[in-house]
Amino acid sequence: MSNLDVIEKNARENHVPVMLEDGMEFLVQYIREHEEIVNILEIGTAVGLSSMKMAEIRETIHIDTLEVNEEMYKQAVNNIKENHLENQITVHLCDGALYHTDKIYDLIFVDAAKSQYKNYVEHFYDNTKTGSKFVFDNLNFHGIVDNPDLTHNRSTKQLVGKIKKFREWIQNEPRFKTVFYREIGDGIAISEKL
């Protein structure tokens, strides 16, 4: 078992919010097939698993990854160092909505506060170019977005409503061409900047 496999196993056993396995495989394969993807911004580091898997695709890939939780941040930094990927991955301890940079990214992977997805698009829009992609995870939210009766929790219903509203917005947003992959992971969308 590789070191990344151990990190992934521990994360899943401890309910750390990491991407579902088939969703991660899909994202890695997508980046592998698109060699123009070199500069990546990840919003939501957790323990650094997805960053490390993306960095392993090509040595030319550089990732800025943002994590708001200090414990997760420390664990991610440690995991990245242990896997000798600190030259490719820079972890920033901050809220994604407060991060500012002049960098232009080929891909922005959004896997953070679901209710803030639209704000992240607007906040980082100028950090992209024509052809850059936004990748969004958790757009099904465990199947509840399409079947809201699966929960009776009021705050979950509100969150699901925001995710549904975001899905409709990004699908119809004329600045992007969006493709949904509802059957992969917990629902993924890729929005390409036009």
Predicted feature locations:
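A short alpha-helical cap/connector motif
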Residues: M1-L107, K114-K133, L139-L194
